Amino acid sequence: MLQRVGETVDPKDAVVKIKDASFPAPFASELEYNSPVHGNWNIVHTGMQVPEAIQIYVCADNCMRGVVLTAAEMNAADRFSFVIVEEQHVLNGNLEDITIEGVTDVLNKRGDHPKAVLLFTVCLHHFVGSNLNYIYDELERRFPDICFIRCYMDPIMQKHGLTPDQKLRKAMYDPLPECEPDAKTVSVFGSDFALDESSDIKRLLRRYGYTVRELLTCETWQDLLDMSKGRLFLDIYPAGKYGMETQARRLAREHLYLPGSFDYEEIEQQLKQLTDALGLPEVSREA
């Protein structure tokens, strides 16, 4: 016979009636259930946008379940690998070695070397104080022909600071090299989808002979690197703003944040920002 060993759950703090729920946080931010389903897109979908690259996740089984299923759902299992972290690895204090040797084993077993590896470290690396610089330095020494992109799957950090998604949308552009800008090129950062050909921004830029570079239209690794040639960096997606601004500062480029809007006045204001930045004639509502 089963016997209750704890106290009966008091619904007072465990339940909130709809009429009493307050926006934006109806529940106290304490111990929470982590649902295995978070919506349509996650960091695996986003990382798969990088051409000629693979993703490697170093984490425990429970954390792996969602990302590996995403790769399978995308029919992209050939671009996805993982290194399973077990309890003994944490207790023995050798998580750096497990990460390095695990990634090395994955790459040695591949028939080819990808142009880049999006290497995702996780919460455990934070908990045990792993030396991430040592990990990446050693991997870059072993595989000088591969670009290792520093990515994170650390949802413990979502209560403050940048989310894993924001950090990923910055990291994907870290390989962009310093170069002289092309006066007739504009680069668009941080989006999940390429701008539609009928969009105001793209029609305006095409009208004046500008090349628009976007990650979603890049077919090769070199196409991605060529995004640094843009004289102006744009972002239209909130989660990509941090990454775009960071790369613009690093590469000394002018940048604009033009988020999607359904307000005519705001749209006109954004188009004016764009024309002013490029020195183009102001757009009229009739144009």
Briefly describe each language-model feature range.
Residues 1-287:
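An N-terminal assembly and electron-transfer interface module characteristic of large anaerobic redox
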